[in-house]
Amino acid sequence: MVARHWILFFSKHEEPTPRLAVTISARYGNAVKRNRFRRWLRERFRTHKKNFTGLDLHFVAKQKPMHLEEARYKEELHEDYQRLLARFR
């Protein structure tokens, strides 16, 4: 799934446990911002883990857009999560 600010790769696997890989470009911001976003993303994944049974997800964040507030950026990501979940329900 390709979006304006990130790419989300996903594939099915035999194990029931979902897995998440996160790649964030240094262009996203300094280490504090990248790690904060990575923690937020992992928490979002953890709370919705039951919806991703049998999937491997690889999230690749590109450069954070300067015109978007962080809250709006996260809102867009949440919308893409919902679209991904709709594909597998």
Language-model-detected regions and their locations in the chain:
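Positively charged, solvent-exposed patches that mediate nucleic-acid binding
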Residues: 1-89
